Amino acid sequence: MEKFLVIAGPCAIESEELLLKVGEEIKRLSEKFKEVEFVFKSSFDKANRSSIHSFRGHGLEYGVKALRKVKEEFGLKITTDIHESWQAEPVAEVADIIQIPAFLCRQTDLLLAAAKTGRAVNVKKGQFLAPWDTKNVVEKLKFGGAKEIYLTERGTTFGYNNLVVDFRSLPIMKQWAKVIYDATHSVQLPGGLGDKSGGMREFIFPLIRAAVAVGCDGVFMETHPEPEKALSDASTQLPLSQLEGIIEAILEIREVASKYYETIPVK
């Protein structure tokens, strides 16, 4: 069985100090869980915040520098997201995986720019997109030269200010790419607090259990030492102190469920 992928880190690059604190813990976990491939994630620009008054970040230059510090200090792989095509090249200098935001998952120029860098590309499936439509996204990336492609399930719009996860999407999307389950954004209530998104953190672990049982290739979890003080996604980030326990549970569930991943499909 391949290593299980865990993408984790604070939602936004609030400070270099925060990144190093979280990076130190993820490095420790990487030494404990040898069957897991860890990738450190944080965003230099939260470009689609609900309100103009919300914290966006410190910009590309600061972000790349801070992420490089984490990479050099702890030897962790790095991922971050881009929002415009011109950002692909400078981000590729530090990122091992380039992330495409859900709202931008169909933007052809952005996908091609990410693919052109030669880095792995992880596309968040839009909240508006059917799982079978991600095949077109993958074809665009392959056309651009991408060799390592991930698709991330992060919930589907379910009326106003709500998301629901349809776990059928995991085996559907696995037909053309490796599939990641986004455990923290999937429990968001988009715009649910008026000028910012809310969320239901208590459902992070129940839905992770389901995703691993169905058979995802990895999980994405935004994590923060003090989520209630986070400058973005305060309602859904996982407390850093709980990350280790969740990974232990993931591996136990995967060990049992993996025996049945390749069963004969019922038709």
Curated annotation (Swiss-Prot):
Subcellular location: Cytoplasm
UniProt GO molecular function: 3-deoxy-8-phosphooctulonate synthase activity
One Gene Ontology cellular component: cytosol
Pathway per the UniProt entry: Carbohydrate biosynthesis; 3-deoxy-D-manno-octulosonate biosynthesis; 3-deoxy-D-manno-octulosonate from D-ribulose 5-phosphate: step 2/3; Bacterial outer membrane biogenesis; lipopolysaccharide biosynthesis
Cross-referenced Pfam families: DAHP_synth_1 (PF00793)
Catalytic activity: D-arabinose 5-phosphate + phosphoenolpyruvate + H2O = 3-deoxy-alpha-D-manno-2-octulosonate-8-phosphate + phosphate
UniProt keyword list: Cytoplasm, Lipopolysaccharide biosynthesis, Transferase
Enzyme class: transferase
Taxonomy, superkingdom: Bacteria
InterPro entries: Aldolase_TIM, DAHP1/KDSA, KDO8P_synthase
Enzyme Commission number(s) of this protein: 2.5.1.55
UniProt GO BP: keto-3-deoxy-D-manno-octulosonic acid biosynthetic process; monosaccharide biosynthetic process
NCBIfam families documented for this protein: KDO8P_synth, PRK05198.1
Family affiliation: Belongs to the KdsA family.
Subunit structure: Oligomer.
Protein name: 2-dehydro-3-deoxyphosphooctonate aldolase
Protein's organism: Aquifex aeolicus (strain VF5)
